[in-house]
Amino acid sequence: MPVDRRSLLTLLAGGLASPAMAQSSSPNGAAMSRVTAYAFSFAGLEGDAIRLADFTGKPLIVVNTASLCGYTPQYAGLEQLFMRFHERGLMMVGVPSNDFGGQEPGGVAEITKTANKEYGVTFPLAAKAEVVGPNAHPFYKWAASERPLETPKWNFHKYLVGRDGHIAAVFATQVEPMEARVVDAVARELTRIE
C-alpha cells in the first residue's frame, strides 16, 4: 500500500502540535514559560522598589543573604564581582532572608550595618523576604519552577539570570562569588548577544 506523504506529514505535525497545544492551554504551561525574571520586583531595603524590569537585557545575580551566617563574608566577594562587571552591565540584588537558621533576625539598621558598613556593599539590597516555602517571594517561586532541583538550601545561594531573563546558572552557597566558574558564567552572559 503506497504511503501518501501529505497525509503522513499532516499526521506527524498534528502529533507534534498536540502536546504543545495542551501545554499552552494549561494554566501553568506556555504562559508560564514566557515569564522572565524581569516580571518581578522587590521592596527595597530602604523603601524604594527594585524593579527587575529596569535590568532587562542585562545579566543579573540574585542572592539571598544573611548577616549572622558563616557565609556572610561572601558579601565581600559579591561586591568584588559586582564592581568588576557592573560597568559592562552586570546587575546584582541581595535579598536578606531569615529562612535558614534565623541568621537574619535584625531590621534595616542591622542589615545595612553588616552589608554596607562592614562589607562595603554598593549593589541594591531588597527588604527582608522569604525565599523558600509557601510564602516565598514570587521571584523565588518562579526560580523554583525554572530550576526545581536548584532551590536555595542555605544563605548565599546565587541565581545568575541571563540577558533573556531566564536562569542561566545557579551557584550553591559554598561557591565563592569570585570562583572561576562564577566569573566565567557572568563573562559569558555579558558577551552573549540577544
Please provide the spans of the model-predicted regions.
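N-terminal secretory signal peptides and thylakoid transit peptides that target proteins
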Residues: 1-15
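Terminal helix/beta-alpha structural elements that buttress the NAD(P)+-binding lobe
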Residues: 38-39, 127, 162
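Short active-site neighborhood of thiol/selenol oxidoreductases, capturing the structured segment around
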Residues: 55-70, 92-95
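Structural microenvironment flanking redox-active thiols in thiol-disulfide oxidoreductases
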Residues: 71-136
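Thiol-/selenol-based redox modules, centered on thioredoxin-like
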Residues: 141, 145-194
